[in-house]
Amino acid sequence: MMEASPGLSIAITFAVILLALTGFSIYTSFGPPSKQLEDPFEDHED
């Protein structure tokens, strides 16, 4: 088995974290938790 270089390991770790944060953000924005989000512009009355 080949040994991975430290740079490759860091790049893969960074990519996985970025994808996880992106997925969680999309889930929060459009999934079931989105019903709890409030729109501050709708709440503000002129």
Swiss-Prot record:
Disulfide bonds: none annotated. Its main location: membrane. Keywords: Membrane, Thylakoid, Transmembrane, Transmembrane helix. GO terms for cellular component: plasma membrane-derived thylakoid membrane. It is found in: Cellular thylakoid membrane. The chain crosses the membrane at residues 7-27. It comes from the Bacteria. One of its GO terms (biological process) is photosynthesis. It is a single-pass membrane protein. InterPro entries: PSII_PsbN (IPR003398). PANTHER family: PROTEIN PSBN (PTHR35326:SF3). Belongs to the PsbN family. May play a role in photosystem I and II biogenesis. This is Protein PsbN. It comes from Synechococcus elongatus (strain ATCC 33912 / PCC 7942 / FACHB-805) (Anacystis nidulans R2). The gene is psbN.
